[in-house]
């Protein structure tokens, strides 16, 4: 009897090896979302942090999980994330914004830009713009200590929830280098930021003489109320005077450059 049982077992094993066992293989389980952390920042359309913004997962296994942005607009949200995870940023008084994570990264960071529900102040028009150097910049020659230009502010094409500017300032008729002949203006409500900056360098470069140039870089901001007419505000940045160009790429030797950085330069704007 014992030999018969052993033989029967052997026959069953052989049958399985010969493919007579028709049991279908089971598909591997779908990977579950990865437990991770997503960090980021929330700003308004003038790059001010928005404290108290609610950051919430709106789909997937952790739908409803949320956190609150701190006083710097920064947040950290832990949960189960995959490429389809949708995260919303909302706060009263602002138009909410949403991000889909897409392909996960090793250290994901999200950037939300929320527009106020109230429209931004309209500052379009023709102006006279003056840059005045800080009095603590004794090395700058008088010719570049104060520079005045006719200027025009025009609306820029932007989308809600983006980091794009609301306006652009140009200088018709002024001898500025191509690509360094404008700067952008960001607006949130009645708060205005003049971004006189191009890749952390001068946004405006004026040709003074055939081989001498004046450049200015910096940021200035203020609240203008219901309209922009006349303002005089601090400009944090640098005035730079190149006494003699050393190459076709506008390189200026250190001994031919006069530069002054300060938080107390002035930007003066008067409507014409």
Predicted regions and their residues:
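Edge beta-strand at a domain terminus
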Residues: 232-272
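Extracellular beta-sheet/turn segments enriched in Thr/Pro/Gly and aliphatic residues
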Residues: 18-29, 102-121
